[in-house]
């Protein structure tokens, strides 16, 4: 029997690799990158629904304190016109200006994906900054599409939040 990595049969490993994936993109921002991190890392997350209610209708703190590493928040979002809920655990790396959000519960995202992680990183690029958005996921089966709709949603969300922060 041909073995893949970690002693897993090569056929099973190839099947798993086809179900696991990663999507990345970058969004140029004009606002302060730290402000964006605080909006999604938690310290100011409760302000997001007031800024972009067409994307985020509500955010509740379920465990910990706003902005604490390991805190749990529940978001009510509007993705492609459909209301979805998403509960996440937050991991913050202030030094690398990175926020990791690990899905714990979700209406669609965990219905279709066994695991779903969002990573946002603020990266200086010359005169500007970008938010690097990464979605890491593991599909429940081969018929599940890549989470392109969520990537599109996040692109629009970050553009709109950035615009509101610049106007403030």
Language-model features: where?
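Short, surface-exposed coil-to-beta transition loops
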Residues: 22-24, 83-88, 112-119
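Beta-strand/loop substructures that line and gate deep hydrophobic ligand-binding cavities in soluble
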Residues: 91, 100-156
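Residue-level signal for tight coil/turn positions that link beta-strands
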Residues: 31-33, 94-96, 126
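Glycine-rich portal/gate segments that line the openings of hydrophobic small-molecule binding cavities
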Residues: 47, 57-109
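Hydrophobic ligand-binding cavity/cleft-lining segments
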Residues: 2-68
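C-terminal helix/juxtamembrane-tail motif
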Residues: 2-20, 148-168
């Amino acid at each position: 029997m041909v073995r893949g990595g970690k002693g897993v049969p090569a056929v099973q490993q190839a099947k798993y690799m086809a179900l696991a994936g990663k999507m990345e993109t970058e969004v140029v921002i004009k606002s302060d990158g730290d402000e964006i991190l605080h909006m999604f890392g938690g310290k100011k997350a409760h302000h997001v629904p007031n800024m972009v209610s067409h994307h985020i209708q509500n955010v509740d703190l379920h465990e910990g304190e706003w902005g604490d590493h390991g805190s749990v928040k529940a978001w009510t979002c509007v993705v492609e016109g459909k209301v979805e809920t998403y509960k996440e655990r937050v991991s913050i790396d202030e030094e690398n200006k990175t926020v990791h959000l690990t899905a714990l519960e979700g209406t669609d995202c965990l219905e279709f994906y066994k695991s779903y992680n969002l990573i946002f990183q603020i990266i200086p690029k010359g005169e500007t900054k970008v938010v690097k958005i990464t979605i890491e996921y593991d599909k429940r089966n081969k018929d599940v599409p890549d989470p392109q709709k969520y990537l599109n949603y996040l692109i629009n969300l970050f553009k709109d939040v950035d615009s509101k922060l610049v106007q403030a």
